[in-house]
Amino acid sequence: MSENRLIYLPLGGAGEIGMNAYVYGYGRAEIERLIVVDLGVTFPDMDGSPGVDLILPDVSWLIERRDRVDAIFITHAHEDHVGALALLWEKLGAPVYARSFTANIARRKMLEKEQPENVVNTVSIWPETVSAGPFDVSFVPISHSIPESSALLIASPAGRIVHSGDFKLDKTPIVGEAFDPCLLYTSDAADDLLC
């Protein structure tokens, strides 16, 4: 008997700075529908990796399941969250969703690598929702050091998760919007928080 399950798989960025790439999946084991949050790079330690310019997350697990990847969501435009998108998109082939500032950066990166820019979709903040397989994803403004940074409210049949992305607690940020915690205290509040 097969049961549906919710999975979370960090491919980079967990326990390290840079190379953010996370997978959420829902469904029966081995046939879950998948979404990706961020596709970033990291920069090498010049003492230990001379001649290496960028390090990408290992997405071989995702490539093997490419037909199950429903969407890629980018939380903000820092290189460690969007820097690998144009380098890896062709291997995954899923539509990309981001807020306006981040989407424009992502489109530019796609053009530079001769990838189709029209796969990058601009979305508005919550309550707008993007449906991707069994997931409904909303972008929630959060303070950070770059415009239009977002946490993601990810709803699945198993519950709701907040994927925070990078953030700083700042009620009056110089760049971007302040986080409104009231957004998480609605009837659609999250069951889990992943930072």
Residue ranges and their predicted role:
Residues 2-73, 78-187:
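His/Asp/Glu-rich metal-coordinating catalytic cores
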Residues 185-195:
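Single conserved hydrophobic/aromatic residue that forms the stacking wall/gate
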